[in-house]
């Protein structure tokens, strides 16, 4: 079923992180000799590089390691905020990686790019799911799947690139619902793993170290997690406190970190101040309408 979904992809470019999901896709498409691209920050520590190189060697597929400078990343931040229309630091940090990968594909005159989107939601890959009690896990997986969204689609549309995600094929989505939660999250040896059924199914087809590699967010793998320390070091503490106070007084927005402040200032210059809605469904930090969610997609506040 997943092979069929991969084979139906028209693009011949893979966004490769060297994680489980993109490696499974590379395994199914290896006979095509697809082009793979990995985004790695030059100036920060990135964990994906070795794994991407291992996948490239294992499946004999060409790999471009696109090493991006801090200047490239700062430019990508502004473009990503412009497209996603939020200043959620975690979402921005992760999705500038995909912005840079999709931008690279466009520069190579590719019409599309293939991603591993969806596997973490459908097969319980997120770290916060791993330690959920058994009686809560199934409901939590269902909740995650009901609100899943993929900013890569917005980025691709903005850049004129088709984003194809084999795990989000309707047949796979429906099939994933029939898999018991104890096959999605389970112990293997002494460790508890999300996406257990995917790992077990493909452990003989892909490198073992990748099959059982712990979930690594894009921001860690590409190195953009280093942005937090960058902003902490370049923004003066006193200036931060002064700006934080002014923004809270004038805009009614509570800024939590220096990184968030940088993103908010870009967002505000582009889209202005968020209007406060009537009722109890507004985020207490930024006034965005969150309905019944504990997570604010606009500013990244959690729990609220």
Locations of the language-model features?
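ATP-dependent adenylation/pyrophosphate-handling site
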Residues: 12-62
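Short, charged low-complexity linear segments at domain edges
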Residues: 253-285
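Mid-to-C-terminal catalytic subdomains of enzymes
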Residues: 113, 118-134, 145-251, 275-279, ...
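A conserved beta-strand->alpha-helix junction
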Residues: 49-84, 115-117, 122, 171
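A conserved donor-nucleotide-binding helix/loop in the catalytic core
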Residues: 91-106
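Short glycine-/acidic-enriched loop or helix-start segments at secondary-structure transitions
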Residues: 25-26, 75, 123-126
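Phosphate/ATP-binding catalytic cores across multiple sugar-kinase/actin-like superfamilies
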Residues: 1-14, 104-110, 266, 270-278
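Hydrophobic (often cysteine-bearing) scaffold residues that line and stabilize catalytic clefts
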Residues: 25, 48, 93-97, 164, ...
């Amino acid at each position: 079923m997943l092979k069929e979904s991969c084979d139906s992809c028209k693009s011949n470019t893979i966004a490769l992180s060297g994680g489980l999901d993109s490696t499974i896709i590379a395994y199914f498409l290896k006979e095509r000799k697809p082009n793979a691209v990995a985004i790695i920050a030059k100036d920060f520590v990135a964990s994906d590089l070795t794994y991407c190189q291992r996948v490239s060697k294992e499946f004999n597929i060409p790999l471009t390691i696109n090493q991006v400078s801090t200047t490239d990343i700062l430019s990508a931040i502004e473009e990503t905020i412009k497209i996603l229309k939020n200043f959620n630091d975690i979402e921005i940090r992760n999705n500038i990686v995909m912005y840079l990968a999709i931008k690279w594909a466009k520069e190579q005159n590719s019409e599309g790019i293939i991603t591993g989107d969806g596997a973490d939601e459908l097969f319980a890959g997120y770290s916060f799911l791993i330690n959920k009690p058994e009686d809560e896990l199934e409901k939590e997986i269902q909740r995650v799947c009901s609100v899943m969204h993929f900013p890569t689609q917005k980025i691709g549309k903005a850049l004129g690139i088709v984003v194809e995600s084999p795990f989000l094929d309707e047949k796979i989505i429906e099939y994933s619902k029939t898999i018991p939660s104890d096959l999605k999250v389970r112990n293997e040896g002494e460790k508890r793993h999300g996406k257990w059924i995917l790992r077990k199914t493909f452990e003989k087809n892909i490198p073992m170290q990748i099959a059982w590699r712990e979930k690594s967010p894009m921001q860690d793998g590409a190195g953009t997690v280093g942005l937090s320390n960058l902003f902490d070091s370049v923004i003066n503490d006193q200036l931060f406190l002064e700006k934080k106070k002014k923004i809270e007084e004038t805009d009614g927005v509570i800024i939590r970190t220096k990184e968030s402040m940088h993103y908010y200032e870009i967002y505000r210059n582009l889209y202005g101040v968020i209007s406060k809605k009537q009722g109890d469904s507004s985020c207490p930090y930024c006034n965005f309408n969150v309905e019944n969610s504990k997570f604010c997609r606009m500013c990244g506040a959690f729990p609220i």
